[in-house]
Amino acid sequence: MWRLKLGEGNGDDPYLFSSNNFVGRQTWEFDPKAGTLEERAAVEEARRSFLVNRSRVKACSDLLWRMQFLKEAKFEQVIPPVKIEDAKDITYENATDSLRRGVSFFSALQASDGHWPGEIAGPLFFLPPLVFCLYITGHLEEIFDEEHRKEMLRHVYCHQNEDGGWGLHVESKSIMFCTVLNYICLRMLGEGPNGGRDNACKRARQWILDRGGVTYIPSWGKIWLSILGIYDWSGTNPMPPEIWLLPSFVPIHLAKTLCYCRMVYMPMSYLYGKRFVGPITPLILQLREELHLQPYEAINWNKTRRLYAKEDMYFPHPLVQDLIWDTLHIFVEPLLTHWPLNKLVREKALRLAMKHIHYEDENSHYITIGCVEKVLCMLACWIDDPNGDYFKKHLARIPDYMWVAEDGMKMQSFGSQQWDTGFAVQAIIASDLSSETGDVLKRGHDYIKKSQIRENPSGDFKSMYRHISKGAWTLSDRDHGWQVSDCTAEALKCCLLLSMMPAEVVGHKMDPEQLYDSVNLLLSLQSANGGVTAWEPVRAYAWTELLNPTEFLANLVAEREYVECTSSVVQALVLFQQLYPDHKTKKISRAIEKAVQFLENEQKPDGSWYGNWGVCFIYATWFALGGLAAAGKTYKTSQAMRKGVEFLLTTQKDDGGWGESYLSCPEQRYIPLEGNRSNLVQTAWAIMGLIHAGQAERDPIPLHRAAKLIINSQMENGDFPQQEIVGVFMRNCLLHYATFRNTFPLWALAEYRKAAFVTHKH
């Protein structure tokens, strides 16, 4: 059986190192002796059930580690289930019982170090490049044994669409990019050209060939196929590493781009500059024959540069972008790849790109900023020195990315330990069940305190285009090293709320100087318009987004301000100012004032706000109303709050819930779920948004109806069912936060119980 291990490094591994003794680290290991016959049967039933129901619920319920933890905690649900017949008859006691059931279940899932584990995956282009990299370097069988490969194959099979292709994410229609990547992944994992479950390979290959073959794969795919030797570098758009040599004042300099754009281009430019091609093995030669419609040697690669499958085209290239690529391809690249510029300029640029790669690797303990970047940087390090320590340090951190669930083994974005824990702690605090949850809060508090970044990036970090990170929290764990504004704000809120509770119950409060560092970080990420960015200050002009080379994602080139980040920061700063009124008083007050103006300015005509990190308008409206309420705005005094409430009330479903399709994100307009369905997590967000705006005092009936849905949807053990994915990034791709289905319904019930029953208010 597979077992989740926590907070462990290998003391004998000189290539593995940590800033806080691996607190929050999650790795999976296969133990052939683990589990009773009954436990193994339960795992197999979870796998079978997912496969049977995958057309209805595309995301896994993340059951394997939950089974493990519940057994280790000897969890048994002793609080009877609650069912509500009529929303008007809902009582404080009903809400309390349901809340206690959910909190007791969720508390049993807390890790020993205080965080809540959980999957953060969903995109179907994460795993294949890792397999490609290890295949090229000759480490595939060393890193992944038979059990690993069995679970990887399970994951690929589980998410193949009926038409034979794979989507951008598990809920998406098939696209060329992910279909090609997953087909090659299957072949490298040992499946034959007509092999795989239910003729998986044959069906996928037919999907590809019916749409013109792999020459129609989008830009990122063309790069990976060129690396593998299934495509030719001359058919890709140029990514000259010489861009690193440009002066930083140039508008398109990588120093100015969004950190994720910069971190992808960094190793890609190195690979492009090297024109690296992996070993041309018999399998690669077979793939050339299988995936092209004409002989490989007869393909006109220059013509294929602009070929893209229509299924992949979310962000078509503007004319100006194609003109730039053509200029670089026709005039610039021939100069840079021939003497003397190949020696004078190209080699210097490659060395500088590698310098940046090593710097980012070291500062993230070889986790890197995310899984896409991780694989590219690891491959670049191997090319630079196949037997070097840099590559070996990368290999040591691969387990940090792997996750196993009933739908198999997948590669995660990187981890959401801190993000999930910050919300979980706030939900449990809101439950007012401290007599039952003191130990849980104490462990969560301890995890948050140990996970704060305590220093800035090493050396002259500004020359490496990095921002301050001291005082921040990451999305995952401290070793990751990348500051995020909303993760920092939510963690800061936790620390401040816990500081108001007895130390003997929740542990000692955080040192004020560390809180000051967090505030300093948050203030540094506010723009002139009052909005708050996610990772770094805005450095690029908005028009640079026209240069986005990735056809299936958007908002990729320039950092920008986000409603959710701004709201989280407002809430954290307001609470901080209440507890530390003499620290940077004027600066913080002005920051809050400007942030509120930003939130008001970002509201849509229908009263909603657009969400960048969750689906979508409901998510951002919850955040925005919370930020406005924290700053003292009310339904009576704020038109923005009144309009936000109107949006939520007019989108409530007949069953009392809310349900928004992920299509709202790419379409940038509110689209309800098909079939008038509700989603419990989105329902929870709407409840909390309405409570922020004082709905309980005006008319609690909409809240009662929504609470009834949540309570009646609770499962026998206190869990909640997995439904549609509600996380998103880069406007067009979903991200599955598996703990959300517990955290937010519990949090909403907690806030509802406090707000909707006047006679029980303290």
From Swiss-Prot:
It is an enzyme of class 5 (isomerase). The record marks 419, 613 as: Transition state stabilizer. Its EC number is 5.4.99.39. It catalyses: (S)-2,3-epoxysqualene = beta-amyrin. The keyword Signal does not apply. CDD domains: SQCY_1. Coiled coil: none annotated. PFTB repeats lie at residues 99-141, 149-190, 441-485, 515-560, 592-632, 641-682, 703-744. GO terms for cellular component: lipid droplet. The active site is at 486 (proton donor). It holds the Pfam family SQHop_cyclase_N. Keywords: Isomerase, Isoprene biosynthesis, Repeat. InterPro entries: SQ_cyclase_C (IPR032696), SQ_cyclase_N (IPR032697), Squalene_cyclase (IPR018333), Terpene_synthase_CS (IPR002365), Terpenoid_cyclase/PrenylTrfase (IPR008930). Component of the oleanane-type triterpene saponins biosynthetic pathway. Oxidosqualene cyclase converting oxidosqualene into beta-amyrin, generating five rings and eight asymmetric centers in a single transformation. Belongs to the terpene cyclase/mutase family. This is Beta-amyrin synthase 1. It comes from Barbarea vulgaris. The lineage of its organism: Eukaryota, Viridiplantae, Streptophyta, Embryophyta, Tracheophyta. The gene is LUP5.
